Regions:
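A short, charged, and often flexible helix/loop element on the N-terminal side
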Residues: 45-71, 75, 79-88, 119-125
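Conserved donor-binding/catalytic core segment of Leloir-type glycosyltransferases
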Residues: 2-4, 144, 179-191
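Carbohydrate-associated surface elements
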Residues: 40, 149, 169
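Acidic anion/phosphate-binding donor-loop and adjacent secondary structure
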Residues: 155, 165-184
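Short beta-strand scaffold positions
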Residues: 82, 145-146
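An aromatic- and histidine-rich active-site surface loop
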Residues: 79-114
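Membrane-proximal helix-turn-helix segments that form the acceptor-binding/catalytic region
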Residues: 99, 112, 125-143
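N-terminal subdomain of nucleotide-sugar transferases
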Residues: 1-43, 48-51
Length: 191
């Protein structure tokens, strides 16, 4: 099976989704032929065991579309997995893949939680919902939630009920167990 993961940024400063991609690719490459597509950055993380492609950014709309379609034609993936919301590039990556007949999984990474939706609702979220985000969620072949609570919140939106829960993993390889425990008696006061 061939899988393409799209993530808007692999830069170290991008936080959680970038760290998630590093952990995911480490394990997923054991099971599938994996490709990651993103946009160039000054300080990208290292993604091992898969091929990483960088395509033009959204501001170079036609270049981004051309490169993405070329990659889809060359790689012929079984699944395209889009990681992120609230960025037009993510919605267009999904739209172009589905226009060519590819199945798309959308992972919002908690970005559709009620508290995120409420933040800057009138100035950012509502326009994005009107222009691209609602359609992207509705048309995704599968939504990937990382917890039951995320699934419940996605269902409350009413946009798409094709939701699967797959929890994020934890890499315990480099965690050392403490060999000795010192017992401290402390009083904690909360007011």
């Amino acid at each position: 099976m061939k899988v393409i993961h799209y993530i808007p940024s692999l830069d170290r400063s991008s936080g959680g989704t970038t760290a998630y991609m590093q952990l995911l690719t480490k394990e997923l490459t054991r099971l599938v032929e994996l490709y990651v597509v993103s946009h160039a950055s000054e300080n990208p993380v290292v993604i091992d065991n898969c091929t990483v492609y960088f395509i033009p950014e959204f501001r170079n709309f036609m270049g981004m579309k051309r490169q993405w379609r070329i990659l889809l034609t060359q790689l012929q993936p079984d699944v395209v997995h889009v990681n992120c919301c609230w960025m037009p590039a993510c919605a267009f990556i999904q739209k172009w893949a589905q226009a060519l007949g590819y199945k798309v999984v959308l992972t919002p990474h908690g970005m559709l939680e009620p508290w995120i939706m409420a933040r800057h609702y009138w100035t950012r979220k509502l326009p994005a919902l009107w222009f691209y985000q609602k359609a992207a969620v509705m048309k995704a072949d599968v939504l990937h939630a990382t917890a039951e609570s995320e699934k419940e919140n996605l269902l409350k939106l009413g946009y798409n009920n094709r939701i699967k829960i797959i929890a994020n993993g934890i890499d315990v390889e480099n965690i050392e167990m403490k060999s000795s425990w010192k017992r401290n008696k402390e009083i904690l006061f909360l007011s």
